[in-house]
Amino acid sequence: MIDEAKRLAPRFAARAEAYDRDGAFPVDDFADLRQAGLFGLMVPERLGGAGAGFARYADVAYELARGNGATALIFNMHASVTGALSGVTDELADALGLPPEALEARDAHLKAAANGSWYAVAMSERGAGSRLSQMSTSYEAVDGGFHIRGAKTFCSGAGHADGYLVAARSAADPSQVSQFLVPAGPGLRVE
C-alpha cells in the first residue's frame, strides 16, 4: 500500500493547485484512492482489506500528503472510521454486550470499505464544535432502528462520502452519546 501511495502522490500534486483554487473536492484523487484499494487499508484481511495498523496507515498518509494535504486529511477521516470499527474485536464486543447485529453491521461496513466505499466524520455542531459534551444532535430508538435529529456544521468530504459517522445524544438518556454510521441517501441532507 505504501507503493500505491507513492505512485499516487505525484498525480495528486499535479491536481492540488486547481482543487485549491476552485475550492473543489478532490474527486479524481478519491477515484484513484478507490481504484488503488486504499479505502480498505485498515480493514481486516478476513474482510477483504489490507489489515494495516496505525503505523502503516501513518506511512501511507504521509506519502499521500506529499501529493495533496487536503486529500490526505479527508482520507484520514475515513481511516479513523475504519480503524475504529476494526478495533472493535469480537472479544471486545462480547465484553461490551453488543448484540450480534452490531457485529454484522461492523463487518458489512468494513467489507464495503474494502470494496471501495469511503466514510466521512460528521461531528462538529454550531456553538459546540466537536465537543461531545455540548452536542445537541439526538437519537431515539424506533421500530427497525434509530431516528437521528440534528445538524452538523462541518464535515470534510460532505456530499461525496458513501456514509457518515455521526455522533448523537440519546433522547431518553442525554448522558449517553453514541455514534452511528449513516449511509448517504434518503433521510440525510447535505447543504
Role assignments for model-derived ranges:
Residues M1, L98-E104, P174, S178-Q179:
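Short, charge-rich amphipathic segments
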Residues M1-D59:
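Alpha-helical interface subdomain recognition
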Residues A9, Y119-A120, A168:
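Glycine-centered structural positions embedded in regular secondary structure
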Residues D22, P44, T71, G129, ...:
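Generic secondary-structure boundary/loop-capping signal
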Residues A31, L41-R149, S156:
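Glycine-rich flavin
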Residues L132, V190-E191:
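A short, acidic/glycine-rich surface segment
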Residues A151-V190:
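A short core secondary-structure module
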